[in-house]
């Protein structure tokens, strides 16, 4: 009989990084949580046969990766609006909601960052979590995705990946080359990435929050990069250009100061805000922010996400 306390002691420390791994694979926080639960259940059932020939961490990653690969056989690719069509040039048209599409979800940093305050550990946890990376990886076939994440993000040796996937080292290297070739053909949003705690970035974020809270469209226009992008899943349309984005916001958002409140949080290793309208949860804004302005806004219009960020549904 396996001792449940012993099992918990040996596996609990890996839960957060396994959640990050499963999320990178499937692009959904909800599905990643389910897959971590499945991983732990499978590990519990097989724990009595674990001989320690591989480390506990490697063993759990093998179980988690195989669980993800099995799940991806029966699921559709997670996407952002920019992965479906070109940008819209009409920000004043009524939005087209597409709740049937499996949208990419944001990962709250609080769910995956290590409980220790070690800066190096926190930076390592953020690696490979950028929303743009997660979105583009979803274009890869599942096994290419797994190899790329294990090799390029987690820095596993080719021999370790080969053992996990039960293939040859040659097959791993070939799969990684095909993944890189596929990614080179895909557009990847890039910016001068800065840490969210950079003082210049913090100042940009303060101005962003103030612009919404004060309904200051002029300030927002100045803050957004000229070619900034805004996406709003589950709305299919997305917009490029600061002037179009501000027209969109002026058309669809409250226009009186004090009607919007912004609460700082973080997602995918990026700065984010809980966006409240008249005190009620509305959306999560995940930002690509640079010291000189906002490059991209992904506004997830789903108040159900707030709980995962430890944010209240209401500020009233």
Residue ranges and their predicted role:
Residues 1-20, 30-36:
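A short, charge-rich alpha-helical start-of-domain segment used by transcription regulators
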Residues 2, 101-144, 198-202, 206, ...:
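Amphipathic alpha-helical segment used for protein-protein interaction
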Residues 34-41, 54-66:
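Structural recognition of an alpha-helix C-terminal capping motif at a helix-to-coil junction
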Residues 39, 63, 132, 148, ...:
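Hydrophobic positions on the alpha-helical face of helix-turn-helix-like DNA-binding modules
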Residues 40-56, 70-79, 138, 186-190:
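Sigma70-family region 2
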Residues 65-83, 90-98, 185:
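Arg/Lys-rich amphipathic alpha helix in sigma70-family domain 2
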Residues 138-157:
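Short amphipathic alpha helix immediately N-terminal
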Residues 158-164, 169-255, 259-261:
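Solvent-exposed, charged amphipathic helical/linker segments at domain boundaries
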């Amino acid at each position: 009989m396996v001792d449940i306390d012993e099992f918990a002691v040996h596996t609990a420390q890996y839960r957060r990084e396994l959640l990050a791994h499963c999320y990178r694979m499937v692009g959904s926080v909800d599905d990643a949580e389910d897959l971590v639960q499945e991983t732990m259940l499978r590990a519990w059932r097989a724990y009595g046969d674990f001989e320690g020939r591989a480390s506990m961490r490697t063993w759990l990653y093998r179980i988690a990766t195989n669980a993800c690969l099995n799940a991806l056989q029966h699921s559709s690719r997670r996407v952002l609006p920019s992965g479906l069509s070109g940008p819209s040039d009409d920000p004043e048209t009524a939005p087209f909601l597409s709740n049937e599409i499996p949208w990419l979800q944001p990962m709250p940093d609080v769910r995956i960052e290590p409980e220790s305050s070690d800066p190096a550990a926190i930076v390592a946890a953020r690696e490979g979590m950028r929303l743009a990376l997660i979105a583009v990886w979803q274009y890869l076939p599942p096994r290419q995705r797994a190899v790329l994440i294990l090799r390029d993000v987690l820095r596993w040796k080719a021999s370790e990946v080969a053992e996990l996937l039960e293939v040859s080292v040659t097959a791993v290297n070939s799969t990684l080359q095909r993944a890189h070739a596929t990614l080179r053909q895909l557009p990847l949003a890039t910016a001068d990435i800065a840490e969210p705690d950079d003082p210049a970035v913090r100042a940009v974020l303060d101005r962003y929050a103030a612009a919404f809270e004060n309904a200051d469209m002029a300030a927002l226009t100045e803050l957004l990069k000229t070619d900034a992008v805004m996406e709003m899943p589950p709305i299919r349309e997305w917009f490029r250009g600061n002037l179009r984005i501000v027209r969109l916001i002026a058309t669809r958002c409250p226009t009186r100061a004090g009607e919007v409140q912004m609460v700082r949080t973080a997602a995918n290793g990026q700065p984010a805000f809980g966006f409240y309208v008249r005190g009620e949860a509305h959306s999560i804004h995940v930002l690509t922010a640079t010291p000189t302005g906002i490059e991209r806004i992904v506004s997830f219009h789903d108040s159900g996400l707030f709980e995962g960020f430890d944010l209240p549904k209401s500020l009233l």
